[in-house]
Design a protein with these regions (language model features):
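Core catalytic alpha/beta fold that binds nucleotide/phospho-ligands
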Residues: 1-132
Length: 132
């Protein structure tokens, strides 16, 4: 299994907090799945958690080489946690189609937070270096 792409993103908490204040449920439902929202709501640092997931989604869009455009929906990328707390990416829709076409079999993601920022790094893996 080899690394075929990498994406990274940095998001400041005030940016996400402002979007939530200005657009409320419309923003949340457009960008985050129900389980991502539930995870943030169940955490005292909800904005930080949303910012981390937003950064992870941006990092994934960078590694598939598209950015957010066309038929791609933010909710095509869902960030969940394993039982041990490790973030994990689930793809669907247009992003899944693009990842499959690129030969991506797994995406490893890491999210960290500072006092004001969330940073996410995503690495795309393929079965072999002879990816599509």
């Amino acid at each position: 299994m080899g690394i075929i792409a990498h994406g990274i993103d940095l998001v400041d908490f005030p940016r996400i907090e402002d979007m939530v204040k200005r657009h409320g449920e419309r923003f949340l439902d457009r960008v985050f799945t129900a389980s991502e929202q539930q995870y943030a709501n169940s955490n005292k640092n909800g904005i930080e958690k949303l910012a981390g997931r937003f950064a992870a989604k941006e990092a994934v869009l960078k590694l598939v080489g598209t950015g957010w455009r066309g038929k791609i929906a933010w909710t095509d990328i869902e960030v969940v946690n394993t039982e041990t707390g490790q973030p994990q990416v689930k793809l669907s829709g247009e992003v899944k189609k693009i990842a499959d076409k690129l030969g991506i079999t797994q995406i490893s993601v890491s999210i960290t937070h500072t006092a004001n920022f969330a940073i996410a790094s995503a690495v795309a893996l393929a079965e072999s270096n002879g990816h599509k």
